Amino acid sequence: MRIAIDIMGGDFAPKMNIEGAILAAKELENVKLILVGDETHAKPFLKENLPNIQLLHTSEIITAHDDPVSSVRRKKNSSLVIAGKLIREGKADAMVSAGNTGALVAMGILIIGRVQGFERPALAQLIPTYDGNDVLVLDLGANIDAKPENLIQYAKMGSIYVNKMKGVTNPRIGLLNVGTEKGKGNELVRTTYNMLLKEELNFVGNVEARDVLKGHCDVIICDAFSGNILLKSFEGVIETFFSLFKKQVNKNLITKVATLALLPTLRSFKKKMDYREFGGAPLLGIKGVCIKSHGSSNSTAIKNAINQAQKLVANNYINFIK
């Protein structure tokens, strides 16, 4: 198995990408990792000579400020584009990038190609729920201006994903909305609701944002605008919770001592809700395994994203969705 890593993408590139790849290479000894990027920037961080790591030099970088579509077409020797070409040419089985989301989606469509029957790809993420399981939420950032037909396709992609990757039979599909009643929401969600009723899917109705983590659904679909706000709200709430908790703990000796008993539970909870532990968001609907990592990913997040890519390839997900 071969996994390409766009080492020039993300806020802390290439350092964190390379360090994450080294961590993954030690865990996945039978997987070849192809580090795609500028060798001048990369070599100072390649301090270990591992047999399953290869550096592939590229001379261009797609930045966070570049226009997604034009940069993919113009910067043909960028790390992101070359990583995508490796998949298209059968030289890599998967790729990981923490770079420009729009460019990643454009690359997925223009270079790797869409799966027949799916008009638009979607970024998906498994989010922990109260009952200890996960809910797959999509789209989280690939297609801001979605149509009802796109959301129906997301439901089908998500259903296949949780069935094949998690073994969930007849996955429950929910539609993110401002209320649970039929007829709630804007035209997009109302039309999608009525269309879902006619599909051979286990559609359980509308789901409000406050109920996403309650485990009532296996898959929740939404447009990328709503999904991205939902995901970043979760991240912000968790970060704020622990910041406020830390301030309260340090108020006096009693709270400090009491907190010692809670530390194992708090650490476990924080780890479970930490986006760095999730790995990344697979771009579903394209003809290859492509994982989008958080832009501010550290080495642990990159390592977990690579592990996630390896599992998707090992489980033959692409052939199932085709």
Where are these regions (language model features)?
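Short glycine/serine/threonine-rich phosphate/pyrophosphate-binding segments
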Residues: 13-18, 76-84, 88-90, 94-108, ...
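Short beta-strand segments
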Residues: 6, 35-36, 56, 97-99, ...
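Extreme N-terminal starter segment of soluble prokaryotic enzymes
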Residues: 1-4
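Glycine-rich phosphate/diphosphate-binding loop of Rossmann-like nucleotide-binding domains
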Residues: 13-15, 28, 32-34, 39-40, ...
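Phosphate/nucleotide-donor binding subsite
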Residues: 50-92
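N-terminal glycine-rich anion-binding loop in soluble enzyme alpha/beta folds
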Residues: 13-66
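Glycine-rich phosphate/nucleotide-binding loop
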Residues: 109-123, 129-133, 137, 216-220, ...
